[in-house]
Amino acid sequence: MPSRNSINRPKLTVNLNRKNSSISKKRDQRERAGLLQPARSSADSKSGKVKSVPLDLYFEGQKDDHASAKGITNKTLSKKRAKKIERNIKYAQQRRLLTDATAKLEADMEIDIDQKKTKDAKPKTALEQVKEALWNAVEDTSNSGLIIENGQGTVLGGPYFP
């Protein structure tokens, strides 16, 4: 019989069939043992989520994403790891509070600016309206943009030989 890496052998189909059959046997064995419950499409499935045994142990009694499906486990959670998880949860709550507070502050600031404009709005005299129109025209001409002249000595203007 030729070796596994021999040239004159239909390797691909044989190897793929063997691999697929062994995978299906393993999957059937896991299903019979009840290890594939719940299904991956189920909402209770942890498929695609980060697997963390310490978090599962920490949140075991709570109804949460980390709640463990099994009640009995052979793993324990050390006191040091439990304190670390509690500390990280506390930091996450503080970050959430901080972001909420800053978002609220920014929203309040926008409202305050609008209120100041409405409070400060007084009826303008004709002279003030003319002054404002003239200053707006001056600002528009001064902010017209960058004007590049076609002078000597610039890259755009051509060569410069001193």
Swiss-Prot record:
Residues 1-50 are annotated as: Disordered. The keyword DNA repair does not apply. It is found in: Cytoplasm; Nucleus. Pfam families: Alb1. Keywords: Cytoplasm, Nucleus, Ribosome biogenesis, Transport. Residues 1-23 have a biased composition (Polar residues). One of its GO terms (cellular component) is nucleus. The keyword Nucleus applies. GO terms for biological process: ribosomal large subunit biogenesis. InterPro entries: Ribosome_bgen_Alb1. It comes from the Eukaryota. Component of the nucleoplasmic and cytoplasmic pre-60S ribosomal particles. Involved in proper assembly of pre-ribosomal particles during the biogenesis of the 60S ribosomal subunit. Accompanies the pre-60S particles to the cytoplasm. Belongs to the ALB1 family. This is Ribosome biogenesis protein ALB1. It comes from Candida glabrata (strain ATCC 2001 / BCRC 20586 / JCM 3761 / NBRC 0622 / NRRL Y-65 / CBS 138) (Yeast). The gene is ALB1.
